[in-house]
Every structure is written in C-alpha cells, then in structure tokens.
Amino acid sequence: MSRVAKYPVSIPSGVEITLNDKTISVSGSKGKSEFTFPHSVSASHADNIITVSYDESSPESTALAGTTRSLINNMIIGVSEGFQKTLLLVGVGYRAKASGKKLELTLGFSHPVHYELPEQVEVETPSQTEVVLKSHDKQILGQVAAEIRAFRPPEPYKGKGVKYADENIRRKEAKKAAGA
C-alpha cells in the first residue's frame, strides 16, 4: 500500500472542488487548477475530505497514487495560500527589475536578459538583488525559478550568480601558486 496515498487530503474553507470521472478541478482565492488522474487511480470526495484509491495489485499504480495525492494536496494549498520562491542575485552589478509580466536581469553579459513570465506567475523585486516569484501552481513556479537561475548559475569559487534564497553553494578553494 502507498504510504503517501493512504492519508486523506482535507479541504480548507474557501476552496471549491469539482470531481468528475477522471479529472479534478480546484478553485480558490489565488486561482484555479485542474488535474487529470492516471488510468489506474481515482479519487472520491466526501465531508471536505478527498481520498485517493488505486489498484493495489500493480506497483505502478501504487506509485502513481502517492504522486496523485501529493499533486492534489499541492493544488489545494496553492489556490488557498499560494507558493513563493525567492531568488538572490550575488555579484557586482547584478540587478533585477520587474515591470508587469517581464523581468529584466543584468547579469554581467553585454546585454540585459529579458524574461517573459507565464500568466500564472507574479514577480516582485523588493530590492535590486532580490526576486520574489509567487504562483498558485507549484510546478510552474519551480520551472520559472529554475529557468531564471539557469541564466547565471552560482559558481563555486566566488559564489557569483543567481541562487535560491535557501540554497547553500559549496565553495571551492582557488589553486595555489606553483613552486613558490
């Protein structure tokens, strides 16, 4: 039995659930999300609780059931509270400026990097070296944060680059002068 799927998902107040045959639609104050179940997994909704059921004879459906339960839980948290990721720009002259759905990054290239944000993601720049991304969809938020980080990943010698706020960069020691 899946250890993740056996726990029910509770639905907070202010969240609307629509459960069809193979799809679930979750809407709340932060937005709306939809998900289609894998073929061997289904869900039931009663008393503000969602339970995930699956074919226990197949190991594949056991794994998919745990994933489905986690995705439903993330959808509910996303539309009620939302998700947030913070990126830090470390380096001399590294700056970020947000305007609407566009993010302009100065990362030491000969030109500024322009990044067009998806519809579901909002951006704030509390300071020139800090970018705060917010969304109700955890997967899209992580993808956008990874794409922005990929423009200039942190390097191990000085730590310069775009990094997550909670990320630790393993530092390396520079080479010593030979034969001195």
List where the protein language model places each region.
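N-terminal intrinsically disordered, cationic/polar leader segments
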Residues: 2-146, 150-180
